[in-house]
């Protein structure tokens, strides 16, 4: 009985540490800058135009 309590306590501690580490990783992640999508605007626009053109052609 004592061994089962000890294993349960270790399991609870491991889960608590893993949960707190995952929460800390999401909290410490830096926010993307407002200009981070500026480099993606031209390729996205080009892909959209190509998709529309191929839709009209085919």
From Swiss-Prot:
Gene Ontology cellular component terms for the protein in this record: plasma membrane; side of membrane
Signal peptide: 1-24
Bilayer topology annotation: Lipid-anchor; GPI-anchor
Residues bearing the modification 4-hydroxyproline: 30, 32, 34
Main localization, broad class: membrane
Coiled-coil blocks: none
Post-translational modification: Contains 4-hydroxyproline; hydroxylated on Pro-30, Pro-32 and Pro-34.
Compartment(s) where it occurs, according to its Swiss-Prot or TrEMBL record: Cell membrane
Residues carrying sugar: 30, 32, 34
Propeptide: 37-58
Keywords per UniProt: Cell membrane, Glycoprotein, GPI-anchor, Hydroxylation, Lipoprotein, Membrane, Proteoglycan, Signal
GPI-anchor amidated serine lipid modification positions: 36
Function statement: Proteoglycan that seems to be implicated in diverse developmental roles such as differentiation, cell-cell recognition, embryogenesis and programmed cell death.
Record family assignment: Belongs to the AG-peptide AGP family.
Protein name: Arabinogalactan protein 21
Species assigned in the record: Arabidopsis thaliana (Mouse-ear cress)
Gene: AGP21
